[in-house]
């Protein structure tokens, strides 16, 4: 598997991969890793149009400006996407020294260390960005494999909000984690 930065030409394949990845959300023994866009509807595309636009526009925005985003893809020997990690601007205007991390690994490549490689790639890049001091993330507290991965990568737990989300009538806690770059 090779990890490389993505560009605009990669986005159609990335969106197809991400749509498929999000369909695994809480299914067939996979942990629930994010709330579905409509909590009771899992049959339509789980990839909201606004997210597509955020990726398309964000890749061209300079780091430090509102809406910036960087994306890396893990490609297998056939060139298929095996996983991804993105680092993006926080929405708060006074938090330009912080970034948010999101990631995912295709079902066929989980539990092989690829998640750690992706997180390490994002951290290494962020360390090279002088304006960034922190990487933040949000994770459903019950997603124990993801929480364990982030802790092994050096993230620390900053908060856990009980009953933050209600999905299909079930309460879920949300954990907030951070990584100090400096």
Name what the model sees in each region:
Residues 6, 103-105, 139:
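Hydrophobic adenine-recognition pocket in adenosine-nucleotide-binding enzymes
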Residues 170-182:
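Terminal substrate-recognition subdomain of acyl/acetyltransferases
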Residues 119, 126-138:
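Conserved GNAT acetyl-CoA-binding A-motif
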Residues 2-16, 22-29:
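A short beta-loop-alpha structural element at the N-terminal edge
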Residues 19-28, 32-97, 102-108, 180-182:
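Acetyl-CoA-dependent GNAT
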Residues 105, 111-125, 147-152:
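Conserved acetyl-CoA-binding loop-helix of GNAT-fold acetyltransferases
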Residues 134-139, 151, 156-172:
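Conserved catalytic-core motifs of GNAT/GCN5-like acyltransferases
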